[in-house]
């Protein structure tokens, strides 16, 4: 697996995780924006997305090499 494959794998994992989170939220019936718990979960998802984005930036800054 080369570095580009690894980066693509990370993107796939991020997309899969976001998809699973959306399914869970839908199944729980948390579809109303005014629901405090829903807002809390959205914030958690946004934090996770930001962390994944920071990891991607770190990988790119290291020349695409995963350690």
Predicted segments, located by residue:
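Short, charge/polar-rich alpha-helical segments
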Residues: 1-19
